[in-house]
């Protein structure tokens, strides 16, 4: 499980577990690595009271999609159409109003006949984060699916499994892939800055092929004329 920085498309804060390790256990470790100045987006299947609570400790703002079956009382309608609500550790706690964490509920539909989307946000003041702006930002959540595909297929190639056959070496393979992906994305970010464009506008596959061509020229990643050439080529 990992975090993604949406501007650079860099994966960070990753956590690796065994087959029997639950996503909830990994997620709790990962959210502890959220930067305090971040806005964290998450899919509806990640939400739980303990995980929301753990993510808040990081200081980051949260914007998570909610499952349709979760009860979220609409306590007060705000100027932008969102609502103040509270989340509780259990139905019993909700009935007694014990342990509630204030949050903001944003509801919207994408078209006729489609279900309602619900976003839960830790930013309570709509003036700091209007509902429409948050809905637009949430679309970036899908970026992580594209980036994980880069890691699984475009960087590693068509192989279905990692090459190692023992746990310790498999872990090393995993971290090596993450480091390689970080290196590619870091160079793409530098190239994007050089050309004043978004990193997401560059082709990851093209970047990997370009780096592979230039790699024999390098013994390290120290700044050099060759590195400058690589940045321009990537753009």
What does each model-found stretch correspond to?
Residues 1-235:
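Single, function-defining residue in the core of a domain
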């Amino acid at each position: 499980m990992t975090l993604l920085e949406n501007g650079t498309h860099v994966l960070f804060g990753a956590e690796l577990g065994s087959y029997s390790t639950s996503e909830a256990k990994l997620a709790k470790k990962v959210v502890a690595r959220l930067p305090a100045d971040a806005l964290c987006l998450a899919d509806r299947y990640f939400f739980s009271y303990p995980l929301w609570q753990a993510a808040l400790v990081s200081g980051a703002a949260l914007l998570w999609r909610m499952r349709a079956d979760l009860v979220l009382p609409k306590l007060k309608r705000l100027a932008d159409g969102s609502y103040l609500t509270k989340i509780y550790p259990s139905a019993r706690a909700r009935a007694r109003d014990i342990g509630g964490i204030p949050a903001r509920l944003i509801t919207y539909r994408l078209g006729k006949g489609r279900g309602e989307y619900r976003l839960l946000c830790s930013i309570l003041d709509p003036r700091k984060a209007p509902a429409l702006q948050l809905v637009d930002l949430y679309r970036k959540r899908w970026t992580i699916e594209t980036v994980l595909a880069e890691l699984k297929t475009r960087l590693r190639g068509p192989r279905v499994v990692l090459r190692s056959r023992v746990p310790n070496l498999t872990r090393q393979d995993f971290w090596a892939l993450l480091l390689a992906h970080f290196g590619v994305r870091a160079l793409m970010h530098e190239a994007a800055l050089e050309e004043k464009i978004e990193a997401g506008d560059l082709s990851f596959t093209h970047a990997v092929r370009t780096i592979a061509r230039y790699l024999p020229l390098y013994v390290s990643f120290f700044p050099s004329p060759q590195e400058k050439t690589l940045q321009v080529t990537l753009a």
